[in-house]
Design a protein with these regions (language model features):
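C-terminal motif of bacterial Sec signal peptides marking the signal peptidase cleavage site
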Residues: 29-32
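Short, surface-exposed binding/anchoring microloops in extracellular/periplasmic proteins
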Residues: 40-64, 239-262
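Tryptophan-paired
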Residues: 68-114, 263-316
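Low-complexity, Pro/Ser/Thr- and charge-rich linker/hinge segments at domain boundaries
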Residues: 127-169, 328-341
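Hydrophilic extracytoplasmic domains
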Residues: 283-359
Length: 359
């Protein structure tokens, strides 16, 4: 299932939900100035650079956790109870605790309670420091509210914790630029309550607190609780989001128009923006636009925001939301079992009346 809407600069045009992915997806054609804040000890050329960064924690909606203790590098996670009540809940760099100038992390050590599973997990592992440092050092270009393009860098290490002890780390900045660092597997542990805890420290071991958290609108929306009632925990779902990647790329068709910036969120939690100046004409067609780069595996769209100028000169903003099951089924039909041998592009077309998109 896919939903879309297009907003004009002056008039808002709501589009009826597109309840199917037609031969759309299925008809995929086979085929200067560094923006980071870093400082280095001049007396030691090998000193590790320092960046201004903080930690954010994500949990899927309906699956709250409480930390017993947690460190990301030398930075402690001060918060305890973490829960998400609205999207984006997976790959969101907002809600960080605090930022400070510090060395980037090389390891994590975290112990937490999974409320839905009623068990404790621990993850103690080295993480990919080289990848993290490269991401922070190289940064990315971003359009700021006044329309200028400026070079920015990441400012958050995002910790995603899903049922089954699944942990995904991203480098992020807000929710517009999110890049995966890696996926890690925690182990279940038998954590006993030590003596001498005060009433607050006791909460993580309290059955009463667990029931309160699982049945409170403050931690899990009522609609989510009712939808998940008597259903098993979908273990493996969050791995599925990142495991299903294919060799594909999007092509945008704007009839006699011009493409603007395109912002995308993916099901694996990553997100990014393609600036309009980075687009090229596809197959020499003036109103077909794509990013001219090597075709490589990429995750599946979750949300797409397309800005463009129509033939009339009117500017529009089109938003599309992709249903996981529908999108996954469509891609599987196209790519089959030999995913490494197939490449494809997804055609995204704006109709001439600027009222809906087709795929």
């Amino acid at each position: 299932m896919l939903f879309s809407s297009i907003f004009a600069e002056k008039n808002i045009l709501m589009i009826k939900p597109i309840l199917f992915i037609t031969p759309i997806l299925i008809a995929l054609w086979l085929t200067g100035c560094w923006g980071y804040k870093a400082k280095q000890n001049k007396a030691n050329a090998d000193a590790q650079p320092e960046y201004e960064w903080g930690v954010a924690v994500n949990t899927p909606i309906g699956y709250p956790i409480r930390f017993y203790a947690a460190m990301v590098g030398g930075t402690p996670i001060v918060g305890e109870l973490y829960t998400k009540k609205e999207e984006p809940d997976w790959g969101n760099a907002y809600g960080y605790e605090s930022h400070s100038m510090d060395k980037l992390p090389k390891s994590v050590d975290m112990v937490w309670l999974s409320y839905k599973e009623d068990c404790f997990y621990r993850l103690k592992t080295a993480i990919d420091y080289e990848k993290i440092e490269k991401l922070f050092r190289e940064g990315f270009d971003e359009r700021v509210p006044n329309g200028e393009v400026r070079h920015k860098t990441y400012d958050t290490i995002v910790v995603g914790i899903a049922p089954g002890g699944v942990v995904v780390l991203w480098a992020g900045r807000g929710y517009k630029k999110i890049t995966e660092i890696g996926r890690y597997q925690a182990e279940k542990i038998d954590l006993k309550e030590p003596p001498g805890l005060d009433s607050h420290e006791h909460l993580i071991f309290s059955k009463e607190d667990r029931e309160e958290v699982l049945n409170s609108d403050l931690t899990i929306p009522k609609a989510v609780r009712e939808a998940n009632k008597n259903k098993p925990i979908p273990f493996g779902l969050w791995d599925s989001y990142r495991d299903h990647q294919y060799q594909w790329f999007p092509v945008y068709e704007i009839p006699n128009g011009k493409i603007g910036d395109v912002r995308a969120r993916y099901w694996n939690g990553e997100a990014g923006t393609t600036l309009y100046t980075d687009f090229a004409s596809y197959m020499s067609k003036e109103d077909f636009f794509y990013l001219e780069e090597p075709i490589e595996k990429r995750p599946l769209f979750k949300e797409l925001v397309i800005s463009y100028k129509a033939e009339s000169g009117q500017k529009y903003l089109a938003k599309v939301w992709f249903d996981w099951e529908a999108v996954l089924t469509a891609y599987q039909e196209v790519f089959g079992k030999e995913t490494d041998k197939v490449t494809a592009h997804l055609d995204i077309r704006v109709n001439r009346a600027n009222t809906y998109l087709t795929f």
